[in-house]
Amino acid sequence: MPGPWLLLALALTLNLTGVPGGRAQPEAAQQEAVTAAEHPGLDDFLRQVERLLFLRENIQRLQGDQGEHSASQIFQSDWLSKRQHPGKREEEEEEGVEEEEEEEGGAVGPHKRQHPGRREDEASWSVDVTQHKRQHPGRRSPWLAYAVPKRQHPGRRLADPKAQRSWEEEEEEEEREEDLMPEKRQHPGKRALGGPCGPQGAYGQAGLLLGLLDDLSRSQGAEEKRQHPGRRAAWVREPLEE
């Protein structure tokens, strides 16, 4: 590409000479040589300008390519997050929050990456354990005492445990009470009259007979242990009838 000064010099030479043909050719060559000698760095300057323009175009092109690449990366990350499981996204967000808390100095909770329902179950279980921990059996809730036993007959549940005792046990208890307190549940006047001594302190035949009958009934009751009460009553009646 010829320089502008060179073109101007050629135009001036042609205009000034005004002579056709080869008369003006040696003069034009001389003028070109003079201009080249006067401006030796003009061509170099133009070449540098061209290089700078070329570099500028390359830089702009590279910037455009980088912008397109970054936009494609953003689109790809959005696409990946869109096609990802929602639970994994939540876990990643929780991880980011936990990392921020660790950086700020906050302690991470014990329920890291745990199902919310399990957290509630464990919390209620821990509350129950703390409530019943080291507790006296008598101080526990009263409804536990009335709780229905597991796999038990409904009639047996409602029945009184004292009423389930056998008649033999009841007879044994009655005999023990009679041995300890033979005159229990008896009128005090009858005890005084039925004793070996009368109300005036005299011993009679009736008092002796009653004392003997009491002794016999006690001895027979001891021998006839665990016997039906009706049979025992029959043995007691025999000496009376005689």
From Swiss-Prot:
Transmembrane regions: none
Any one annotated GO CC term: extracellular region
Pfam family of the protein (one): TRH
UniProt biased composition (Basic and acidic residues): 157-167
InterPro entries: TRH
Region (Disordered): 63-205, 220-242
Signal peptide residue numbers: 1-24
Subcellular location, record wording: Secreted
Signal is among the record's keywords: yes
GO annotation terms (biological process): adult walking behavior; cell-cell signaling; eating behavior; histamine metabolic process; hormone-mediated signaling pathway; negative regulation of glutamate secretion; positive regulation of gamma-aminobutyric acid secretion; positive regulation of insulin secretion
Sequence positions bearing Proline amide: 86, 116, 137, 154, 188, 229
Annotated Polar residues bias: 69-79
Repeat in keyword set: yes
Alphabetical keyword list: Amidation, Cleavage on pair of basic residues, Hormone, Repeat, Secreted, Signal
Tissue specificity note: Hypothalamus. Expressed in the hair follicle epithelium (at protein level).
One GO MF term: thyrotropin-releasing hormone activity
Biased composition (Acidic residues): 91-105, 168-178
Membership in a protein family: Belongs to the TRH family.
Role description: As a component of the hypothalamic-pituitary-thyroid axis, it controls the secretion of thyroid-stimulating hormone (TSH) and is involved in thyroid hormone synthesis regulation. It also operates as modulator of hair growth. It promotes hair-shaft elongation, prolongs the hair cycle growth phase (anagen) and antagonizes its termination (catagen) by TGFB2. It stimulates proliferation and inhibits apoptosis of hair matrix keratinocytes.
Protein name: Pro-thyrotropin-releasing hormone
Provenance organism: Homo sapiens
